[in-house]
Amino acid sequence: MGVQQQSELPSQTSAKYFSLREDVSTESLSDIDSQTDINNTGNSGKDYSSPPRLSLWGWYTPSQYRGNSSGVTMKNLSASEDSISLSSLDHQQQPMLMVDHSSNSDNEDGATAKDFKIDIHLKGEDEDDGSGDTRVKYNTRNSGTLRNSSNKTQTTVLNNSTTSSNNINNNNDKEINITTLGGSTNSTTKFLYSSVDQSNGSTIRYPYSPSYSDATFSILSGVVILFSIIYSLLVGPIQIMFAFLVSILVFISYICASFAANNRIYLYSITALAVGLGLTIPSFFAATGAVVLGTGRDKSTWDVELFKSDQVLMGWMWPKGQMAIFVDESTIIGPDSFIGKLSTEILQLSYISYYIWGYFMEIYILYNLWRCHLSKDPQQQKMMPIWDQRLKMFICSWISTYFIVFSINLIFPAVSPRVYIGKTLNLYNNTLEGFGFAGFVRSRIDNAAKGSFGSFPSGHIATSFAIGLSSYKILPAYGFVSTIAAILIAIATMYLRYHYFVDFLAALPVTIFCLLYGGFYTPSDFKNVFVNCFYSIKSIFQNILSKFNNK
């Protein structure tokens, strides 16, 4: 039995108070799968507790954010309706509380008794902001605060499970922030899009457009198959056998996922598809080099132009515009000094970590997707479409960078400073061995990179930043760490003689485009970053000038 919380009324405030006690029997909680819909039309017998149906093109959605009390299910919102109807309430309308009792009971016998205290009042002149909003409060074991104003509605919910923050914008330019506090895990989700689960008629709020994420994922799968066909026509499938087999895996698994009869088949198919798309990295990297050699593009590489561009852009800072030459000639941080050896080891380790960040995040998303499917908790099952969408969007942000880079490599093949400056021009006097480990890794990379012409733009830089920034939208801590690793990788590519500075510059727009393509970011996000940077730099210069003027 919940305990009512005492509340003191502020003076000169018109307020109405009432208490609502709600007892839920054990029978209504014992079998969630037996709950049926009794909506406003009088229809019954439709099961809304079944797991959501997953599909590449069906956009099936689970029945979450749905109120149920004593076996009676509230009418579900249509796809055109906003996720929470309270945002459109005016002061004369009574707010509606939607309570979900599908969670575990606090009592040992399974029964739950909850006490609500609801405070409805208009702000008076004694409150400073004068927005004249309607405030609704209720206290219970799962307590919360909901605020409805003309511009913004904010809801805070306290529970014992997870922590999440959700922002929902409706068609009336009102924003709904839903923050859930408690438990050991933290996540941030913005639910902006509604869609109807065609398998049971229920509604889910997606953080991103399901139509967009499904379309971009399908386009990426088609691009992989198209590259395989074009490469096969240019040099034959035998020369690119690994990439050809991977493209077949992508094609078959995509077809199976599109026509999957149930979630289990879909998950097996989408897992195979995710693995296949992950394998496009090494397979099409080698295939692109084979196509450059097979078409004779290796006879006209662009290393001379890239080297001259570095001299123009960075010649004022480094000799011949190369960080690697500056390090090679330095007596303090040179390859033979202790600092130089330590730097070489750290940066070489950072460089090879590029190969794991994307795969680890892909495995993490697949793990959560399968965990939701295998869970017996209906609330966990209802998160399957969210993790499915995250998988598609992350793969689009991650893998699309490679195919843009591969396309540019075919047009502007280059062998990298390690080969052109080091072996053709002989401008490096020392080798980068570090304490031994770096030299071992470099020898393996040199052997694996024979026949490679992928210097411009830097795929390492483009992909690393795409992984870090997209991962931040899924798992912020992982995204932060992988973004730091991306910065180290960017430095390592030039320090370790793998890329020119212009390779770094060309990789940045590729990263931005792929993040936009994946859907985690919008053009306004990048615009805000540039605007904030501009004003920050402007403020710094203004402060410096003001100090000089004061003197």
Curated annotation (Swiss-Prot):
Entry's transmembrane regions: 211-231, 232-252, 273-293, 346-366, 393-413, 474-494, 500-520
A GO CC term assigned to this protein in UniProt: contractile vacuole
Task: Indicate whether Membrane appears among the record's keywords.
Answer: yes
Against Gene3D superfamilies, the record matches this protein to: Phosphatidic acid phosphatase type 2/haloperoxidase (1.20.144.10)
InterPro entries hit by this protein:
Aur1/Ipt1, IPC_Synthase-Related, P_Acid_Pase_2/haloperoxi_sf
Q: Which residues form the signal peptide?
A: none
Q: Which GO terms describe its molecular function?
A: inositol phosphoceramide synthase activity
Query: GO biological process: any one?
Result: sphingolipid biosynthetic process
Q: Which UniProt keywords apply?
A: Membrane, Transmembrane, Transmembrane helix
Q: Residue spans with biased composition (Polar residues)?
A: 26-47, 137-152
Record membrane topology: Multi-pass membrane protein
- In residue numbers, the region (Disordered) covers 26-50, 123-172
Query: From start to end residue, where is composition biased (Low complexity)?
Result: 153-171
Keyword check for Transmembrane: yes
Cellular compartment(s): Membrane
Cross-referenced Pfam families: PAP2_3
Family under the similarity heading: Belongs to the PA-phosphatase related phosphoesterase family.
The record's section on PANTHER family has: PA-PHOSPHATASE RELATED-FAMILY PROTEIN DDB_G0268928, PTHR31310
Recorded protein name is PA-phosphatase related-family protein DDB_G0268928
Q: Which organism is it from?
A: Dictyostelium discoideum (Social amoeba)
